[in-house]
Structures are given as C-alpha cells and as structure tokens.
Amino acid sequence: MNSLGINIYEILFQILHITLIIIFIIFFAATLSILERKFLAFFQNRHGPNRVGWFGSLQLCADMIKILFKEDWVPQFSKKSIFILSPIIAFVSLLLVIPTIPFTPNFLIINLNIGILFFLMMASLSVYAVLFAGWSSNNKYSLLGAIRASAQTLSYEVFLGLSLMGVIARSGSFNIVDIVNSQKEVWNVIPQFFGFLCFFIAGIALCHRHPFDQPESEQELADGYHIEYSGMKFGLFFIGEYISIITVSALISTVFFGGYFGFWGSSFFWLFLKTVFFILIFILIRASLPRPKYDQIMSFGWKICLPLTLLNLIITAFFILI
C-alpha cells in the first residue's frame, strides 16, 4: 500500500482477473464460430468442417493462421483512421460488459451501481462501429449496410432498454448484483415474461443475427458494411459478433434467469449452463428461420415489440403500486 492508501497488489490482482476472463471470452467466442458451423451442418444434414484435425477439431487453428497471414488491405479512397478504428470499437464495446456480470456470489470483478446503464451505453457504442465502417469504406454496399444497421439497432435499442425497466422496478436497482440477489425466490422470467421476450428479440437484433441480419445480408448487400475488410480487421468484426452473442446470452441468464442461482445451490456452473443454452438458441434460430424483408423487421419492432414493452411496464407498475 502506497502513501495514498492504494493497494497496488490488489489493483494488479484485479487487472489479472480481467485479463484472464477477457482471454477466456475471446477464446470461447472463437471456438463458438466453429461449433456453430458444426451445429448448422448437423441441422442441414451435412458434415461441416472436417478436413483439419480429427473431425475438424483443428479448424479453429487453421482459420486463425489464415486470417493472420492474409493481406491487411485498406481501400485507396477510404477514410483510413476511421476505417481502422471501426473493428476495434466493434470488438471492444460489448466485451467490456463481461467484467460487470457476477459469476458467483463471491466473485465479481467490477461492481457497478449503474451496471444496466453501462450495458446500454456499450450497446449504443457498437452502432458507431458499424456506421463508421460503412461510411469510411467508400463503398455503396457498405454504406447501405451501415444505414440499415444504424436504423435497425437504434430502433431496437428503444425497447432493449424499456424491456429492462420492469426488472429494474422490481429490484429497485440498476446494479446487476442486486438484480441477481432479488431472484433468490423467483426468477424474473416468470413475472417479466414479456420483458424477457422483448429483450431476447432486441438482443438478436443488437448482435445482427438471423433473422435480423439485414445489415450484412449476403444475397442483397454482398456481406454489408464489412465487405471491404480483410485479415485481422475482418477477424475483429467476426469475433466481435460472437462476443456480443455471449454477452447478450449471459445478461439474459443473469437478469431474467437468476444468474448463478440454480435449482439447488449457487455456482458458476448454473450461469455457464444457462448462457450456453441461449447461445444454442441463437444458433437454432439461424438454422430454422427465414430472413424477412427490411420493412417487416422495422414494422415488427415499432408495431409489436414497442407496445409490448410499454404494456409490460404498465402492468409491472400496477402490481408494484398495489
């Protein structure tokens, strides 16, 4: 401890914790990309990646080597500084939410009193990555994808926040730890089912996942806003998408399904099991649902999801007041 009363070793220990968890999440996200391809192959009655290693077990290493040795190309007429900054923002934005999630009753890296607001802030920051990427690429398909992504994400963020208001009203706090502790008896998914449903839908849209993958639809926009990216820059966008899936799945498990509280006891195992379950739901949705038109996506958000979140908030307020 120095003259200012700051424990240097405790700070270094916290930094080590954060670093190890971030490395684990990045590795898990990279592995998830291969697992998704295997699951999609299973659902579509084909083999999937099976050439590198035993049953394709080394495909992740092959993909990493390929991305590392690809030319890291920058378009000639692009805005180079913004072009380079965009994948970094996409990679980092939702990754920073992970340390605010309580893993066990006794293990939490950062205890923020405004944990939910911090998540919403980071979710809003991810929009800038897409918008900057599309605009700075100087490509019409990239720009169209960025415009789609910005409009879709900003629309769905409205009820992404509103769907959490019922949970916040019940727990009386924006702190994620307080929200988890309020679910010792009953998980929030039971009294807040409509809130959970809208948050899950908005989370899919936030991750730009099927069926809300309009910004990067290959058939219409030739891969959308990151068409001009290659090498490690594309890898950051690619891994960033899976990090967002992990973050949203972990938040759903924490806010609506009791977090580390299980059917008996409380441990990291329950949080991990719930998170993996929702990740599999993401993959299953991609394998089974068609992609609707862009106007249908926007109409669904404003005409169905937004009224549903407002109705859920009114019902929650009514039961709290009585």
Curated annotation (Swiss-Prot):
GO molecular function, a single term: quinone binding
Keyword Plastid (UniProt): no
Protein localization: Cell membrane
Pfam families referenced in this protein's UniProt entry, alphabetically: NADHdh (PF00146)
Domain of life: Bacteria
Chain ranges passing through the membrane: 15-35, 82-102, 114-134, 149-169, 186-206, 243-263, 265-285, 302-322
Function as written in the Swiss-Prot or TrEMBL entry: NDH-1 shuttles electrons from NADH, via FMN and iron-sulfur (Fe-S) centers, to quinones in the respiratory chain. The immediate electron acceptor for the enzyme in this species is believed to be ubiquinone. Couples the redox reaction to proton translocation (for every two electrons transferred, four hydrogen ions are translocated across the cytoplasmic membrane), and thus conserves the redox energy in a proton gradient. This subunit may bind ubiquinone.
HAMAP family: NDH1_NuoH (MF_01350)
Protein name: NADH-quinone oxidoreductase subunit H
Organism: Buchnera aphidicola subsp. Schizaphis graminum (strain Sg)
Lineage start: Bacteria, Pseudomonadati, Pseudomonadota, Gammaproteobacteria, Enterobacterales
